[in-house]
From Swiss-Prot:
Family to which this protein belongs: Belongs to the TACO1 family.
Species in which this protein is naturally found: Oceanobacillus iheyensis (strain DSM 14371 / CIP 107618 / JCM 11309 / KCTC 3954 / HTE831)
UniProt-recorded name of the protein: Probable transcriptional regulatory protein OB2038
Taxonomic lineage: Bacteria, Bacillati, Bacillota, Bacilli, Bacillales
PANTHER family membership: TRANSCRIPTIONAL REGULATORY PROTEIN YEBC-RELATED, TRANSLATIONAL ACTIVATOR OF CYTOCHROME C OXIDASE 1
Biological process per Gene Ontology, one example term: regulation of DNA-templated transcription
Comp. bias intervals (Basic residues): 1-14
GO CC annotations, alphabetized: cytosol
Gene3D superfamilies: 1.10.10.200, 3.30.70.980
Compartmental location: Cytoplasm
HAMAP family per UniProt: Transcrip_reg_TACO1 (MF_00693)
UniProt region (Disordered), positions on chain: 1-21
Gene Ontology molecular function: DNA binding
NCBIfam families recorded: PRK00110.1, PRK12378.1, YebC/PmpR family DNA-binding transcriptional regulator
């Protein structure tokens, strides 16, 4: 994973995603809903919820909206019932794609996802058709914009906390954990005053698929089309993106 920085790819696509700010509160609301549904509504013990709330606040989402979605997820407030669904398939050039959605209308969402694949040179597969090509890992980014953090110190602290790998990047350090160790590592780092730019349990491809310039352009159009859906939460793929 050291040669394929998720953080760099996040930064690379941020400007494009910022152009879709009209949907950003809906995305944050669903992130908060998922985190609270899976781990409870206590920010002190639910690192995923804490991260989702921090990201929402960074985009100026009102506190009332945040609280309302936590209450919906934990059952203390009536509202729409959302269902998590995972789609698997292939993009142009045989790129493996996993799409995580949260929807209150699975028929609508299935049609949107299927249309995005078909229109952009991909095809949906059965459950399990590509998921075996990915590993589930805890992923944490420690900010180091000023370059003041010492790599040896961070590495020792991260390993002490339970991380399995530390990768220095420009302006940040990426940490990887086993999923079951993720919460404890986040807690340890926060208690030791590290600033976390990102933290989540997510998927990483075991191998990467390098495409021709033409096929890569088609693949990026597929990703953009999927991101246009309000229901799509995460898109995982094994494309080796060119610089």
């Amino acid at each position: 994973m050291a040669g394929h920085s998720k953080w760099k790819n996040i930064q690379k696509r941020k400007n494009a995603q910022d152009a879709k700010k009209g949907k950003i509160f809906m995305r944050h609301a669903k992130d908060i809903y998922i985190a609270a549904k899976q781990g409870g509504g206590d920010l002190g013990t639910n690192a995923a919820l804490r991260t989702a709330v921090e990201k929402a606040k960074a985009d100026n989402m009102p506190n009332d909206n945040i609280d309302r979605n936590i209450k919906k997820a934990t059952g203390s407030l009536d509202g729409a019932t959302y269902e998590e669904i995972t789609y698997e398939g292939y993009g142009p050039g045989g790129v493996a794609v996993i799409v995580n959605v949260l929807t209150d209308n699975k028929n609508r969402t299935a049609a949107e996802v299927r249309h995005a694949f078909k229109k952009n040179g991909g095809n949906l597969g059965e459950n399990g058709s590509v998921s075996f090509m990915f590993d589930r890992k805890g992923y944490i980014v420690i900010e180091n914009e000023e370059g003041t953090l010492d790599e040896d110190t961070i590495t020792m602290d991260a390993l002490e906390a339970g991380a399995e790998d530390v990768v220095p990047q420009e302006g940040a350090f990426e940490l990887y954990t086993e999923p079951e160790d993720f919460q404890e590592v986040v807690k340890y780092l926060e208690e030791n005053d590290y600033t976390l730019a990102d933290s989540e349990v997510t998927l990483f491809p075991q191998n990467y698929n390098q495409l021709s310039q033409e096929d890569e352009a088609k693949m990026m159009k597929l990703i953009d089309a999927l991101e246009d859906s309000e229901d799509v939460q995460d898109i995982h793929h094994n494309l080796e993106e060119s610089n």
